[in-house]
């Protein structure tokens, strides 16, 4: 017998944070592998964060911000400014 999991919509904050990280990564022309290496996390974990499937720890957010060359505050500001998870225009 298998149990089906109901689809749960990711929290808007996670969508926004993941979208901001993806936007900055692409803007800097970094692959997921390159950013993950620089932030000392697994590329699969970065993919999950960008897709809002994982809620990163504070230490992971700090490492990602450092690897992207911005402050954590700037990363959160960008995610708040574009809260829909889509790249800024």
Give the positions of each predicted feature.
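A short, Lys/Arg-rich alpha-helix, primarily the initiator
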Residues: 2-27
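Short, charged recognition helix plus adjacent turn
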Residues: 2-3, 66, 76-89
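Short basic helix-loop element that most often maps to the first helix and adjoining turn
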Residues: 19-38, 63
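Residues in the helix-turn-helix
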Residues: 34, 45, 55, 74
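Recognition helix of helix-turn-helix/homeodomain-like DNA-binding domains
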Residues: 40-54
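Short, basic-rich loop-to-helix N-cap that marks the start of a DNA-contacting helix
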Residues: 53-66
């Amino acid at each position: 017998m298998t149990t089906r999991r109901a689809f749960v919509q990711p929290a808007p904050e996670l969508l926004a944070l993941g979208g901001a990280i993806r936007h900055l990564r692409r803007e800097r022309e970094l692959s997921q592998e390159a950013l993950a290496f620089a932030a000392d996390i697994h590329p699969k974990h970065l993919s999950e964060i960008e897709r809002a499937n994982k809620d990163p720890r504070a230490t992971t957010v700090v490492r990602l911000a450092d690897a992207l060359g911005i402050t954590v505050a700037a990363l959160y500001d960008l995610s708040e400014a574009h809260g829909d998870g889509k790249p800024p225009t």
